[in-house]
């Protein structure tokens, strides 16, 4: 079995794969102040609930966009699983040709998503990840990662509206059936919801126009379902795209990582 860990700015997603099949997955809050023991106890609790043990795991791979948590995360893997994890970063074999100004600055989550989408759905492909930031990645028909766009995520934008507009309340992110709100809260929720649908559709349309292609559009991330259910711009919703990419990258780099 393989343990895959996706460390995002808001949440960490943990999954267990066996023979390329996702058996279990869990989510925990990303806290850069957690110790390796706290991380270990959390993961072991997940395992206990699923009747798994650390000895079931033969390899671990981690993607992280939060550098401060990585020392504790790597220490946890060694201490509780006796495995030195494979880290997605420079030197890892991805199979992608990165045609960007500085490949090292691309977030590992974007690389993982691009690998998974290209393998699973073919190219050209646009990957939209609705996370703390909303990212759009374009991989051309030759499988070349051409770059993309990064926009503030829906949660960041919602919180900024509350923090910077004195008379506006904090609101929950919710699907709105009416674009014309009858109250301040309803108006904010409508603006946030339909605004992000418009952002998503506009960026995708412009990417298609500038690339002069008709790529398949794949969405992932915690808030993807709510947005994509109302948008015709997205072809495929894949909530486990990042975990799939991690498992695939582990197999591509397996000879040097498995215990």
From Swiss-Prot:
UniProt: ATP binding residues: 6-13, 132
Domain of life: Bacteria
Enzyme class, UniProt record, top EC level: transferase
Cell location: Cytoplasm
One Pfam family per UniProt: Pan_kinase
Residues that coordinate or bind substrate: 107-110, 184
GO biological process, one term: coenzyme A biosynthetic process
Main location: cytoplasm
InterPro entries (alphabetical): ATPase_NBD, Type_III_PanK
Residues bound to K(+): 129
Cofactor note: A monovalent cation. Ammonium or potassium.
Cofactor(s) required for function per UniProt: NH4(+); K(+)
Active-site residues, record numbering mapped to chain: 109
Pathway: Cofactor biosynthesis; coenzyme A biosynthesis; CoA from (R)-pantothenate: step 1/5
Its EC number(s): 2.7.1.33
Function: Catalyzes the phosphorylation of pantothenate (Pan), the first step in CoA biosynthesis.
UniProt subunit comment: Homodimer.
HAMAP family listed in its UniProt record: Pantothen_kinase_3
Designated name of the protein: Type III pantothenate kinase
């Amino acid at each position: 079995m393989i343990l895959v860990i996706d460390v995002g700015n808001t949440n960490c997603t943990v999954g267990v794969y066996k023979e390329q099949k996702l058996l279990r997955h869990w989510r925990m809050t990303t806290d850069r102040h957690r110790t390796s023991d706290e991380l270990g106890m959390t993961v072991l609790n997940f395992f206990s609930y699923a009747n798994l043990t650390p000895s079931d795991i033969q390899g671990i791979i981690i993607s992280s966009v939060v550098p401060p948590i990585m020392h504790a995360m790597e220490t946890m893997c060694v201490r509780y699983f006796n495995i030195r994890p494979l880290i997605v970063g420079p030197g890892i074999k991805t199979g992608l040709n990165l045609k960007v100004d500085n490949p090292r600055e691309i977030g590992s989550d974007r690389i993982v998503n691009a690998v998974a989408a290209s393998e699973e759905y073919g190219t050209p492909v646009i990957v939209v990840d609705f996370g703390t930031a909303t990212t759009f990645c374009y991989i051309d028909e030759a499988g070349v990662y051409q770059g993309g766009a990064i926009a503030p995520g829906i949660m960041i934008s919602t919180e900024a509206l509350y923090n910077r507009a004195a008379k506006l309340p904090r609101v929950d992110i919710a699907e709105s059936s009416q674009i014309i709100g009858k109250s301040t809260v309803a108006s904010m929720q409508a603006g946030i919801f339909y605004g992000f649908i418009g952002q998503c559709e506009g960026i995708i349309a412009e990417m298609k126009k500038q690339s002069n292609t008709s790529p398949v559009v794949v969405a992932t991330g915690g808030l993807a379902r709510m947005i994509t259910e109302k948008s015709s711009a997205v072809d495929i919703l894949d909530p486990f795209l990042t975990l799939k990419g991690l498992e695939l990258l582990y197999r591509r780099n397996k000879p040097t990582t498995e215990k």
